[in-house]
From Swiss-Prot:
Name of the protein in question: Small ribosomal subunit protein uS7
Signal peptide positions on this chain: none
Any single GO BP term: translation
Molecular functions per Gene Ontology: rRNA binding; structural constituent of ribosome; tRNA binding
Lineage: Bacteria, Pseudomonadati, Pseudomonadota, Alphaproteobacteria, Hyphomicrobiales
GO cellular component: small ribosomal subunit
Organism: Methylorubrum extorquens (strain PA1)
Amino acid sequence: MSRRHSAEKREIIPDAKYGDVVLTKFMNSIMYEGKKSTAERIVYGAFDIVENRARANPIEVFRAALDNVAPAIEVRSRRVGGATYQVPVEVRTERRQALAIRWLIQAARGRNDRTMIERLSAELLDAANNRGNAVKKREDTHRMAEANRAFSHYRW
């Protein structure tokens, strides 16, 4: 990793149906091997199911799910005098969003429903209602940070 220049931020085009940049990032994270149309089909299909089940705007359910999954604090390893400490640090906004997206997708892929569309819709609904594996992951992260609060003075 070069120390001279940080990578330029690429402009992300909002998705066609809802005009949301975060949703495009979500689709890009779901995408395998450059198959964007498949990723779009999965996300829009899941949004249709969410709309039918929750009787709510799917983009609002999506945003609520992301907010409920995004961690506020995490632990990072810090080596001090031969010992490695897990130091709690606040999470930057971009990383919060990236982690929330990653955890939602991992939790959806880990479910036992038939299709990815069903799995994703179920995980989105669960996360919006503060349930599910993605929310559990965030709570575990917060618990870890709370347990290591004694080392917070090693923050950098």
